[in-house]
């Protein structure tokens, strides 16, 4: 009986169900955003465009900071979060380009059009991610939220590599969350 009671006392606290749902939603959105990276990689493979696009990223980050502030999200937190989303996506793109180079891959027969097919998906996800960041900001200090984030990230974010893009994408959340 004493062991049973001790075991019950050792259970780490979990966040409330509504906070778990908010964390899951954020992780699903991150996964959706990472799912776009192979499409970007295909388009850039065919066009020869560089993976790095610092001017475009800077423009997006400026707009994200403005939109985040309007949504009550700390603009520095939003900038860091989206900067890491860019980095995670570029990791996937670089790995795919390296793989295709090693395979001697010829251009794709029907690559996605960045402007017409890919950017609209990213444009749809960005405000949803900002909204989810507002939730993350609210629950960052909830006891057990960090543990829940870690547990669910591996289940909900499938980056098809070794988990490094996932780790990069959730780094700003890890830094902010209570264990």
Regions found by a protein language model. Give the residues of each.
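C-terminal motif of bacterial Sec signal peptides marking the signal peptidase cleavage site
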Residues: 5-7
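Bacterial signal peptide processing site
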Residues: 9-11
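Immediate post-signal-peptide N-terminus of mature secreted/exported proteins
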Residues: 14-52
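Glycine-rich, aromatic-bearing surface loops/beta-hairpins
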Residues: 135-179
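Second-shell loop/turn segments in exported
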Residues: 23-27, 45-54, 66-71, 111-120, ...
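Extended amphipathic alpha-helical interaction segments
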Residues: 101-140
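Mid-length scaffold segments of soluble, non-membrane domains
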Residues: 70-108
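Stable alpha-helical elements in mature extracytoplasmic
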Residues: 22-25, 36, 56, 60, ...
